[in-house]
């Protein structure tokens, strides 16, 4: 029987930024993409989400809600490269791994359209025949979870 692990990292883009810039971890920040001259939120960290901001929101609306919001440019290509490296790192668990990124796009409509998956990413690991090497599926998942959050 085929067994596949799907890891969804909903805040991959902002978590990656928070690791690179620790001073931002507890402050609300958003990553912005521009489309047709209109900046919009591509990804928001948990502090910004608690303040009511969501991916897809127009930057002007986000600033009206949270004037102190820290804005950074979105780097989806960099996120994709790091996610691919992370998929390679998952080779410790199985020879069959792949990254699956969710790329959001700033919509043309205003003022707010949710971008499901924007700034997030995921990993698929074919664990068929591999879990026993880690003490079973549960132990394997615990190991993956603890290591990936470091």
Write out the residue ranges for each language-model feature.
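Residues that scaffold, gate, or flank divalent-cation-dependent active/transport sites
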Residues: 1-131, 136-146
